[in-house]
Amino acid sequence: DVLFKYARWRQKNNLINRDKTVDAEIARLYRIAAENGHYKASINLQNGALRGRFALSSHERLRLSQQLIDAKVAAGYYFIAIYLEHGAAGLAQDPEMALRYYRKAADEGNPQAQAYVGDKLAPIDIAPDISRQMRRCAAEQGEREVSSDLGVNLKNNKRFQQATEAFQLGVAAGDSTSAGFLMHGFSGPEPMDRLFYLALEKDPERARRYEQIGAVLAKYSWAHPVVPEINDIVPLPPAPLPEWDGKLKWLEEWEANIPPPVPDAALIEKLAKAKQLNPATGRPLPTSPDFEKDSVARLQCRSGEPCPQSGYWQPAWRPRE
């Protein structure tokens, strides 16, 4: 967990002015943590690879996904679904099988898969009720964009109380769009205002707070802000409105930017050795059953990574996977 938290902090501080050398160090720490059973590190590593930040081979992607599945972590099914949908990670493109994996991931509780399946089932001639259930499950787990989609759907079906609750979940997850709907909803729109009417009593103070919170969420959307304390700031009626000092915990922590403990070199060495990994890269050593034999002929290290051995290095085009 020490490696994961430090890598996540480094990743947070490498979002804007991206340094590939830092990305390589982050991937190294995530790899070692993931191979030692830290599923969040595995998820962050694979998500980073999907976004082009970390370099993972097809073999690594499939192996890490299978490790998640074996550990009963639904994200493993979700990653396999993505690879099947796009014909990636050495898998043949198979949209039908991809849908099965998305549904399996959703049924096992993965919020991204629940949002995906919810979108597929949303049309009125398919399964809108199941879609709303899927989206609600995803929203309750903090899936940001799905909350506003659910809220709009419920609002348009005149389920105003449920819509308001969905938007509140969206604000908690960091969705500025949801905050905007609640801001307008508490501003007293007329019933004929089909866009913003939520059957709420006009409450200027609640509207002001949602506006202020929404501005922060929009400004920092790229950093994935969250407001888990939203019900302590703007609880939904009939709960009374408490005092609020205008502060958000996420923003305070973001601005403070306090680094977690730096992983000790001895700890990294110990964890790497336990799983037969190269501590310099986090990749399996030749003695490991997970070592990719063709990696020696194909690629020893990637741009930004420390070289695992001294000597002259020849640049090479990365082969198609």
Residue ranges of predicted features:
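N-terminal leader/linker segments that initiate helical-solenoid repeat arrays
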Residues: 1-25, 36
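Residue at a conserved register position within TPR or TPR-like alpha-solenoid repeats
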Residues: 10, 17, 49-52, 84, ...
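Structural signature of tandem alpha-helical TPR/SEL1-like repeats
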Residues: 18-28, 53-64, 90-101, 124-134, ...
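Canonical positions in the second alpha-helix
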Residues: 32-33, 66-68, 104-105, 135-138, ...
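Short helix-capping/linker turns of helical repeat alpha-solenoids
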Residues: 36-40, 45, 52, 71-77, ...
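TPR/TPR-like (Sel1-like) alpha-helical repeat modules
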Residues: 164-176, 183-220
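Long C-terminal extensions of eukaryotic subunits of large macromolecular complexes
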Residues: 234-293
